[in-house]
């Protein structure tokens, strides 16, 4: 044993890195050194396993996050509503750019909006899976009071069965809807007439044809040769108006959904674009809406 280790005396720095030796064992003609298994070893092994998988995983594991301050009080969101932790993204998937749209008033009647999710088919695979859809709704008027419902729709079902997933909230403050699902679509169904849709309805009373809110949405898609068809859930995340672009948790959440926008300046510019399309015509808003519209209603809270 002295001959084996005589020329390999560890330095002081190496001893700190290796930690205390526990035992020596001979296995298959070689000598193995065992040492205690620490939490750092477990984290390192997990990181290596994630890096070795197909695609890379972006993960926020900091627990609770500070979203900013309002007057003298800190706003702390629990881990259950940590945006960064919720929005784990497999970078092997295709992430769409943010689409900007408007919510326009309809007088004293409910305002309705239809968004068609028809992604570009840029693969030779047989199926495209929509795995996450994120919708941000931000009021652009003072003191909004309207209730809001957002539903994921299959327009090919009978009108009474078109709602696949639904979430509800208010536009008193900015609000985010995150649809988690596994919905595989064959290429022949990826048309404006047959693709999945988002239907939004708001009870805010506002002058007909005038915008009272901005809608921003994005999705992830994944191509494959085998289909999957599972509905999961819709998560509703209300956001306090105290959130600012300089909030670290908010910046990290935006990084995960918008990989091309990594600096605070870019994210501020992205958020500023929430209200940049106020000159969109009502004719374009109403264009292409078919007669087969899902019947939405507000649930009692």
From Swiss-Prot:
<feature type="region of interest" description="Essential for tubule formation and cell-to-cell movement">
    <location>
        <begin position="19"/>
        <end position="159"/>
    </location>
</feature>
<keyword id="KW-0916">Viral movement protein</keyword>
<feature type="region of interest" description="Essential for tubule formation and cell-to-cell movement">
    <location>
        <begin position="209"/>
        <end position="283"/>
    </location>
</feature>
<dbReference type="GO" id="GO:0046740">
    <property type="term" value="P:transport of virus in host, cell to cell"/>
</dbReference>
<dbReference type="GO" id="GO:0044219">
    <property type="term" value="C:host cell plasmodesma"/>
</dbReference>
<protein>
    <recommendedName>
        <fullName>Movement protein</fullName>
    </recommendedName>
</protein>
<dbReference type="Pfam" id="PF00803">
    <property type="entry name" value="3A"/>
</dbReference>
<keyword id="KW-0945">Host-virus interaction</keyword>
<comment type="subunit">
    <text>Oligomerizes to form tubule structures through host plasmodesma. Interacts with host A.thaliana At4g26020 protein, which is involved in intra- and inter-cellular trafficking.</text>
</comment>
<feature type="region of interest" description="Disordered">
    <location>
        <begin position="282"/>
        <end position="301"/>
    </location>
</feature>
<feature type="region of interest" description="Disordered">
    <location>
        <begin position="1"/>
        <end position="22"/>
    </location>
</feature>
<dbReference type="InterPro" id="IPR006889">
    <property type="entry name" value="Bunya_NSM"/>
</dbReference>
<comment type="similarity">
    <text>Belongs to the tospovirus movement protein family.</text>
</comment>
<keyword id="KW-1031">Host cell junction</keyword>
<dbReference type="InterPro" id="IPR000603">
    <property type="entry name" value="MPV"/>
</dbReference>
<feature type="region of interest" description="Essential for long-distance movement">
    <location>
        <begin position="284"/>
        <end position="288"/>
    </location>
</feature>
<keyword id="KW-0813">Transport</keyword>
<comment type="function">
    <text>Viral movemement protein which is responsible for cell-to cell spread of viral genome. Increases the size exclusion limit (SEL) of plasmodesmata by forming tubules structures, thereby allowing viral ribonucleocapsids to spread directly to neighboring cells.</text>
</comment>
């Amino acid at each position: 044993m002295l001959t084996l280790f005589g020329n390999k005396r560890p330095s002081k720095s190496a001893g700190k890195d290796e930690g205390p030796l526990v035992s020596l064992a001979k296995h298959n003609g070689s000598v193995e050194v065992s040492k205690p298994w620490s939490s750092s070893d477990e984290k390192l092994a997990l990181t290596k396993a994630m890096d070795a998988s197909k695609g890379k995983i972006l993960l926020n594991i900091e627990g609770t996050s500070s979203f900013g301050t309002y007057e003298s009080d800190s706003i702390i969101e629990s881990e259950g509503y940590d945006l960064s932790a919720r929005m784990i993204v497999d970078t092997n998937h295709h992430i769409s750019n943010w689409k900007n749209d408007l919510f326009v008033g309809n007088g004293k009647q409910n305002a309705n909006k239809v968004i068609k999710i028809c992604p570009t088919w840029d693969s030779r695979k047989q199926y495209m899976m929509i795995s996450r859809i994120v919708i941000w709704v931000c009021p652009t008027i003072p003191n909004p009071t309207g209730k809001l419902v957002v539903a994921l729709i299959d327009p090919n079902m009978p009108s009474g069965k078109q709602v696949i997933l639904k979430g509800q909230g208010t536009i008193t403050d900015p609000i985010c809807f995150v649809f988690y699902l596994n919905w595989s679509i064959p290429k022949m169904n990826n048309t404006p007439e047959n693709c999945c849709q988002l239907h939004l309805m708001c009870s805010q009373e506002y002058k007909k044809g005038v915008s009272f809110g901005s809608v921003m949405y994005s999705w992830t898609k994944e191509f494959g040769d085998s289909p999957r068809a599972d509905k999961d859930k819709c998560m509703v995340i209300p956001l306090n108006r105290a959130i600012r672009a300089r909030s670290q948790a908010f910046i990290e959440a935006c990084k995960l959904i918008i990989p091309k926008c990594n600096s605070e300046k870019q994210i501020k510019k992205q958020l500023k674009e929430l209200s940049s399309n106020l000159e969109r015509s009502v004719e374009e808003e109403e264009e292409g809406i078919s007669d087969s519209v899902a019947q939405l209603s507000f649930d009692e809270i």
